[in-house]
């Protein structure tokens, strides 16, 4: 659909083989930009001081849909990290972030990566149960490993 081969391959990975989502990524450039923004935020938050994390959690929690999207994006990233820590040869979802995923995986153990993935999955479930979004975001970000 007018997409070069390299970008099509990237979109196929990011969409996880879901054609509808891949089409939305092609049609709506802001979706892809938002993903990049959230992954850049993740990278900036890992070494960030607590005050920065609290401030980010406050902003994030103001829009529940945006928060859910951010957590979903972060979950795909942390799953990639966990797979690399475990030494799995499974293809990454976030192939465009391979270098930083490898870097992070080299600094974490499997139990830490697994805990972050589990925390993100639990956060999505808790959002469905209407828990306090700000508190949820704060706990989530404070529990991330400081790298």
Spans of features found by a protein language model:
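Charged, glycine-rich active-site and insertion segments that engage polyanionic ligands
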Residues: 1-73, 77-78, 84-93, 97-147
């Amino acid at each position: 659909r007018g997409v070069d081969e390299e970008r099509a391959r990237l979109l196929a990975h990011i969409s996880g083989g879901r054609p509808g989502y891949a089409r939305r990524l092609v049609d709506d450039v802001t979706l892809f930009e938002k993903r990049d923004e959230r992954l850049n935020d993740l990278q900036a938050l890992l070494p960030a001081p607590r005050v920065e994390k609290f401030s980010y959690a406050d902003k994030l929690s103001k829009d529940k849909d945006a928060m859910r999207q951010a957590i979903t994006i972060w979950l795909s990233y942390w799953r990639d990290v966990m797979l690399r820590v475990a030494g799995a040869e499974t293809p990454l979802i976030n192939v465009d972030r391979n270098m930083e995923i490898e870097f992070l995986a080299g600094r974490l153990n499997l139990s830490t990566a697994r805990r972050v993935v589990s925390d993100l999955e639990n956060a999505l479930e808790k959002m469905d149960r209407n828990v306090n979004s700000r508190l949820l975001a704060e706990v989530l970000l404070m529990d991330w490993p400081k790298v």
